[in-house]
Amino acid sequence: MRRKSAAMLLCAAVFLSGCGVVSMTPSANLKSTETEESGMKTETTENVIYLAGGCFWGMEQLMQSIPGVIDAESGYANGTCEEDADYRTVCKGGTGFRETVRVEYNPDEVSLDALLLAYFYVIDPTVENRQGNDIGTQYQTGVYYTSDAAKETVERIAAIEKGRSKKFFVEIGPLINFFPAEEYHQDYLEKNPDGYCHIPKAEMELFSKL
């Protein structure tokens, strides 16, 4: 029942965003990110959201399949350690970094509401430090925003989702930092169609047809 109702809400949000009703964020800023010497990216556009949803291969593929998404990039977000993020360091645990996908979108084609509803459709918000078969702090779920407009939307959708579950472990907060993942992680499932993915193919196809 939970997933069925989420799908219905998602379809409604996508339809409304196409009519220019649900889009909650301003028009796109053409410049997206700037990369500092450390490898950390600094956000310079409004129409972006950072989604931690378990293994980033699947979340990246899911977001890329949604019409209106301009780009999805795998990386590591909101670390608390002093080290820069890379796969080996993050997998050791204790860094605070989450496998996260940076999603840039065109608000004239898809709303942030719709992207968040797609996100909550495929994750399990009731478990901590785990999604699917993947266990570890790097697989903790989270939604990280970079603007006041996105904050309002994220908190509104999160409140709805919290009301539908007895437990809710999804981190909700501002983006602190983001390091792009290694090149071999980018577009991983495009390069390896039979590679591991914790999101069922049927759900991928559902959103690609919206």
Regions found by a protein language model. Give the residues of each.
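Bacterial N-terminal signal peptides
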Residues: 9-18
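Bacterial N-terminal signal peptides that target proteins for export
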Residues: 1-8
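Flexible coil/turn and secondary-structure edge motifs
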Residues: 2, 19-210
